[in-house]
Amino acid sequence: MDKKSARIRRAARARHMMREQGVTRLVVHRTPRHIYAQVIAPNGSEVLAAASTVEKEISAQVKYTGNKDAAAVVGKLVAERALAKGVKDVAFDRSGFKYHGRVQSLADAAREAGLQF
């Protein structure tokens, strides 16, 4: 089993538990250059809020989009957009990535902005 398939397997296991519980998820995906965050409805078919470093609004604020500072900006923005839609409680779906570095920075910023998970 290679590194990518192991990550996908971890993510599937966590998503299965979240789907059974029927909770709104804050999903994070990262690449070496960008980080993406989405708030997904409990049924899994609707994206309630989203933010990523690909957006001009965010890339204009940060010097480099693949670091913890950029992840914190994305976390804050996705939390603000989710709160505007009335979503306050979410489950954190880290997509099999370690809770460390950019993923942790995004989660901390989202918590500070008002999301609870």
Swiss-Prot record:
Coiled coil: none annotated. Keywords: Ribonucleoprotein, Ribosomal protein, RNA-binding, rRNA-binding. CDD domains: Ribosomal_L18_L5e. One of its GO terms (molecular function) is 5S rRNA binding. GO terms for biological process: translation. One of its GO terms (cellular component) is cytosolic large ribosomal subunit. InterPro entries: Ribosomal_uL18_bac-type, Ribosomal_uL18_bac/euk. Part of the 50S ribosomal subunit; part of the 5S rRNA/L5/L18/L25 subcomplex. Contacts the 5S and 23S rRNAs. Belongs to the universal ribosomal protein uL18 family. This is one of the proteins that bind and probably mediate the attachment of the 5S RNA into the large ribosomal subunit, where it forms part of the central protuberance. This is Large ribosomal subunit protein uL18. The lineage of its organism: Bacteria, Pseudomonadati, Pseudomonadota, Gammaproteobacteria, Pasteurellales.
